[in-house]
């Protein structure tokens, strides 16, 4: 039971970590060089932004190794990071950005809100004034629209994400 709680707690901490990294590193001067590719149109399967996933995968691999040989709790933390990575891949890369071989656009509920919130995140050109930096949690869409309108960066065609 303790190991399960470690995994669940790690998934929750990873959402906070991902929010922070996305907001202040990826959209900051330090990380925009990689993340910019994610905000630009392209016709290739991979983006420079995917290197962030490699960084977290390497970190999880190190934790798996150290946990297996020296400190077992790190193994369970690495498993939580891996579970979060899988959730991220399904929700962000798959559902929101359609990086899988079929197209599915959610029509209602949690997945719709997540989809719309991330569309609004991409409604801004450049790295400033974006909204909704989390990947599992998305603020209410109406609040995000208000924030974008207040900042003056929301284009009319982006007011109703599809």
Curated annotation (Swiss-Prot):
Which reaction equations make up its catalytic activity? all-trans-beta-carotene + 4 reduced [2Fe-2S]-[ferredoxin] + 2 O2 + 4 H(+) = all-trans-zeaxanthin + 4 oxidized [2Fe-2S]-[ferredoxin] + 2 H2O
User: Pfam families annotated for this entry?
Assistant: FA_hydroxylase (PF04116)
Q: Which InterPro entries match?
A: BETA-OHASE-like (IPR045019), Fatty_acid_hydroxylase (IPR006694)
Which EC class heads this enzyme's classification?
oxidoreductase
The keyword Transcription regulation belongs to this UniProt entry's keyword annotation: no
Pathway given for this chain reads: Carotenoid biosynthesis; astaxanthin biosynthesis
EC id: 1.14.15.24
Q: Does the keyword Isomerase apply?
A: no
Q: Name one GO biological process term.
A: xanthophyll biosynthetic process
- The positions making up the signal sequence are none
Q: Where is the Fatty acid hydroxylase domain?
A: 8-135
Give UniProt keywords alphabetically: Carotenoid biosynthesis, Oxidoreductase
Judging by the UniProt lineage, the source's domain of life is Bacteria
Please list the GO terms describing molecular function. beta-carotene 3-hydroxylase activity; iron ion binding
Function (record text)? Catalyzes the hydroxylation reaction from beta-carotene to zeaxanthin via beta-cryptoxanthin.
Q: Which family does it belong to?
A: Belongs to the sterol desaturase family.
Q: What is this protein called?
A: Beta-carotene hydroxylase
Originating gene: crtZ
């Amino acid at each position: 039971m303790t190991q399960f709680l470690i995994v669940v707690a790690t998934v929750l901490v990873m959402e906070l970590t991902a929010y922070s990294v996305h907001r202040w590193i990826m959209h900051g001067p330090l990380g925009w060089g990689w993340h910019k590719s994610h905000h630009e149109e392209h016709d290739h399967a991979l983006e420079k932004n995917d290197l962030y996933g490699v960084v977290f995968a390497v970190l999880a691999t190190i934790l798996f190794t150290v946990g297996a040989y020296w400190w077992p709790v790190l193994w369970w933390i690495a498993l939580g990071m891996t579970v979060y990575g899988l959730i991220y891949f399904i929700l962000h890369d798959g559902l929101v950005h359609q990086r899988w071989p079929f197209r599915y656009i959610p029509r209602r509920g949690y997945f719709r809100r997540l989809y719309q919130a991330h569309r609004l995140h991409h409604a801004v050109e450049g790295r400033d004034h974006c909204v909704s930096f989390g990947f599992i949690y998305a603020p209410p869409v109406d609040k995000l629209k208000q924030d974008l309108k207040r900042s003056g960066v929301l284009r009319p065609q982006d007011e109703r994400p599809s």
